[in-house]
């Protein structure tokens, strides 16, 4: 059996944890499996490298930043190979150039385009554990690129798809996917399994276990994922195609504090102005989530929308630079907000879900600023200091602690 395993930075943050992961790998080798391991940079290595760069230059180029921070993953895979070799097992570390993994040119947020599996397959045939750097690739000019948030998860799924692996295991510091963040909800329940679509919505609404890009790729190539803890030996959560077509239940509630609300005030109420505004943001690769347009008055309207806090300053800059072109009066930005979402199959056939969610928020004295809905998700924007009360109340209202 060919298994792709991915370990995050916290799982390899210390020498003891590196040896713990090495022992887990050895267990699978002893069982006769071929193993490919994707590793993130250890602990806070990436943050430290970014800080060092900004000491030298507050506005470093994205190309050089990718060159710098990619060294964190190279340290991880080399140290793991050294550890396994010291324990008597064959292992080889490969970076993105050696695999190779090809991406587009978008430094700091590249997309994987193709993976050559010949080198990895040859190393597996030689009996090696293959350790691959996560989070990075190379573009057509042989420059190093990084994949942005969730890049190591995405690397693991892409390798599993390319190698036609039998299993793809994502190891984290929690035991699986829960109905809510256990830090907020003490009786949050671990899910045995969840469908791609629901996991994708949870990932994109604040659940930190898997990144949405990783889930998108898993769904596209039908790669079944197993989310496990690297610290505790226990069954995890399987993420796969949902076969329960008529299932109507809430899978979980998630909160995302990496949100900012931007409002563009006094836009002329005429065709094309919203297109112009969002087209400007699109050209800067700024993703927009919840959108609210006010009722027009005196020939103008206000448009509010949410972006990640990472993109908020860039979004405000772009809009302020184009205020006259848009015909708008002002731009405001609020970062003291958060998005709380419930996710579950069959919401459109169960109209009571929205009412129950809003009742839970009312009971917790939580004010709603914006609302967004889809077939399997309802999201609200609230004050960030009310997140815990909101999540706890919603989890209790839907009795998510009970196994359905």
Residue ranges of each PLM-predicted region?
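Membrane-embedded hairpin module used as a gating/binding unit in multi-pass transport
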Residues: 214, 224, 241-243
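Conserved H-loop
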Residues: 40, 230, 293
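Acidic-aromatic/histidine active-site loop/patch
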Residues: 218
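Short phosphate-binding/catalytic loops that engage adenosine nucleotides
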Residues: 33, 89, 223, 286, ...
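A conserved regulatory-domain signal marking ACT and ACT-like small-molecule sensing domains
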Residues: 56, 236-404
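Active-site C-terminal subdomain of aminotransferase-like
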Residues: 223-234, 257
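Nucleotide/pyrophosphate-binding catalytic subdomain
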Residues: 1-215, 382-383, 402
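Short hydrophobic alpha-helical runs that function as membrane-insertion/retention elements
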Residues: 167-171, 225-227, 289, 370
């Amino acid at each position: 059996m060919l298994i792709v395993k991915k370990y995050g930075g916290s799982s390899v943050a210390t020498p003891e944890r590196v040896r713990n992961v090495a022992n887990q790998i050895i267990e699978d080798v002893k069982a006769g499996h071929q193993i490919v391991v994707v590793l993130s940079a250890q602990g806070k290595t990436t943050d430290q490298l970014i800080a060092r760069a900004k000491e030298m230059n507050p506005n470093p180029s994205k190309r050089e930043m990718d060159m710098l921070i990619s060294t964190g993953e190279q340290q991880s895979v080399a140290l793991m190979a050294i550890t396994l070799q010291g324990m008597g097992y064959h292992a080889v570390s490969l970076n993105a150039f050696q695999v190779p993994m090809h991406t587009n040119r978008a430094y700091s947020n590249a997309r994987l385009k193709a993976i050559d599996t010949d080198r990895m397959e040859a190393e597996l045939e030689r009996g090696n554990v293959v350790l691959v750097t996560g989070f990075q690739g190379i573009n057509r000019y042989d420059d190093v690129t990084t994949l942005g948030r969730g890049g190591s998860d995405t690397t693991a799924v892409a390798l599993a798809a390319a190698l036609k692996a039998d299993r793809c295991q994502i190891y984290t510091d929690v035991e699986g996917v829960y109905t809510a963040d256990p830090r907020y909800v003490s009786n949050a329940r671990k899910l045995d399994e969840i469908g791609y679509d629901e996991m994708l919505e949870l990932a994109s609404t604040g659940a930190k276990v898997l990144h949405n890009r990783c889930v998108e790729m898993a769904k596209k190539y039908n790669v079944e994922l197993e989310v496990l803890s690297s610290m505790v030996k226990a069954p995890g959560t399987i993420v796969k195609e949902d076969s329960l077509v008529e299932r109507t239940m809430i899978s979980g509630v998630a909160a995302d504090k990496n949100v900012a609300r931007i409002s563009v005030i006094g836009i002329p109420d005429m065709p094309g102005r919203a297109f112009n505004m969002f087209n400007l943001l699109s050209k800067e690769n700024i993703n927009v989530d919840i959108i609210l347009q006010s009722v027009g008055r005196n020939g103008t309207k206000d448009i509010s929308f949410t972006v990640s806090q990472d993109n908020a300053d860039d979004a405000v800059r772009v809009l302020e630079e184009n205020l006259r072109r848009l015909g708008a009066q002002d731009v405001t930005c609020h970062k003291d907000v958060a998005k709380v979402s419930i996710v579950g199959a069959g919401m459109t056939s169960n109209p009571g879900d929205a009412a129950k969610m809003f009742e839970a928020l009312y009971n917790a004295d939580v004010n709603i600023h914006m609302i967004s809905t889809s077939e399997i998700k309802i999201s609200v924007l609230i004050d960030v200091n009310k997140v815990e009360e909101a999540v706890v109340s919603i989890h209790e209202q839907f009795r998510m602690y009970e196994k359905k």
